[in-house]
Amino acid sequence: MADIYRFPKFSYEDNGTVEPLPLRTGPDKKAIPHIRIVKVGDPPKHGVRYLDLLLLGFFETPKQTASLGSVSDLTEHTGYSICGSGSLPIGVAKYHGSDQELLKACTDLRITVRRTVRAGEMIVYMVDSIGAPLLPWSGRLRQGMIFNANKVALAPQCLPVDKDIRFRVVFVNGTSLGAITIAKIPKTLADLALPNSISVNLLVTLKTGIPTEQKGVLPVLDDQGEKKLNFMVHLGLIRRKVGKIYSVEYCKSKIERMRLIFSLGLIGGISFHVQVTGTLSKTFMSQLAWKRAVCFPLMDVNPHMNLVIWAASVEITDVDAVFQPAIPRDFRYYPNVVAKNIGRIRKL
């Protein structure tokens, strides 16, 4: 059984909403490109800004149609067939141009895609035709990029391995960063286990503008019967001296003194940002890698939910601090389905 502290609404009402991407089609029945920029922190209104970009679009393969014309018609591709949707995260860079120039440069990119496998399925992106507005990101674009297939493709099993695949950019998600950075809590600190400690986790409840059941993300009903989604992130540990008693009021007072502010960004799809504006103990600060602002991309926390809602409207409706006993050190973590060193199973 866990104890819960609900944060006041003002802690997330200013930047806790993301507007949807407008899904409109032109006369050719193709989606009209659109760029969506949200602000996290207090970025400058004009001039140079730091932008994190995520390119959204469709995976396509060339198709051939039966033709009764000349022989040359039989060898010419007349169009492309969509075989899936996905994204390409290209990271943060300093940018001083306009949003529309950036959108045009992104949609003009020629991106080829290959599905492969290492320890898990991967998507390989190779990029050409990098325009001037994208030069700040060119170092990463020119090198080629590899991502976990389940994080960047909605249905990687639909991408053929025996055909050429291109990625056509239609939408651009941008996060304009101010004082808040996109620092992440290192995995070693997030997995930290300390004796005599209480784990502080955040339960984030969202409302989205699309039905998600058919895509495998089941909502939960709140007290008013509304459908909501939620996910959890780990913030840190509260530790007291041996012999001291943990009380709910003590944990709540520690959290209240932090004066946390929450916001939504578009890093990796949908991202959850936490900023500490109050006092923070040295122990807790060290667990946040000495950062007062941290980012939790939903792409890492819950990849499938992220794939389903990354183009929809998303709104924070509640944020709860969940106080749970820290997992003991002697508990073993099993990341693999196959247990090691049991019976005939041996680690290679």
Curated annotation (Swiss-Prot):
**Membrane topology category:** Peripheral membrane protein
What positions does the record give for the motif labelled YLDL motif? 50-53
- A GO MF label: structural constituent of virion
The answer on whether this UniProt entry bears the keyword Phosphoprotein reads: yes
Q: Which GO terms describe its cellular component?
A: host cell cytoplasm; host cell plasma membrane; membrane; virion component
Localization terms from the record? Virion; Host cytoplasm; Host cell membrane
Q: What does the record list as coiled-coil region(s)?
A: none
Q: Name one Pfam family in it.
A: Matrix_Paramyxo_N
Instruction: Supply one GO BP term.
Output: viral budding via host ESCRT complex
Q: Which Gene3D superfamilies match?
A: Viral matrix protein, C-terminal domain, Viral matrix protein, N-terminal domain
Q: Where does the record place the modification Phosphoserine?
A: S70
Q: Does the keyword section mention Signal?
A: no
Q: Which InterPro entries match?
A: Matrix_C, Matrix_N, Matrix_Paramyxo_C, Matrix_Paramyxo_N
Tell me the keywords, alphabetical order.
Host cell membrane, Host cytoplasm, Host membrane, Host-virus interaction, Membrane, Phosphoprotein, Viral budding, Viral budding via the host ESCRT complexes, Viral matrix protein, Viral release from host cell, Virion
* Post-translational modifications: A large portion is phosphorylated in the cytoplasm, but not in virion. However, this phosphorylation is not essential for virus replication.
Q: What interactions and quaternary structure are annotated?
A: Homomultimer. Binds to the cytoplasmic regions of F and HN proteins. Interacts with nucleocapsid. Interacts with human alpha-tubulin and beta-tubulin. Interacts with host ANP32B.
Family from the record: Belongs to the morbillivirus/respirovirus/rubulavirus M protein family.
- What free text does the record give on domains? Late-budding domains (L domains) are short sequence motifs essential for viral particle budding. They recruit proteins of the host ESCRT machinery (Endosomal Sorting Complex Required for Transport) or ESCRT-associated proteins. The matrix protein contains one L domain: a YLDL motif.
What function is annotated for this protein? Plays a crucial role in virion assembly and budding. Forms a shell at the inner face of the plasma membrane and concentrates the HN and F glycoproteins. Acts as a negative regulator for transcription and replication by sticking to the nucleocapsid. This effect might be regulated by the cytoplasmic interaction with tubulin that dissociates the M protein from the nucleocapsid.
Q: What is this protein called?
A: Matrix protein
Species, as recorded: Sendai virus (strain Hamamatsu)
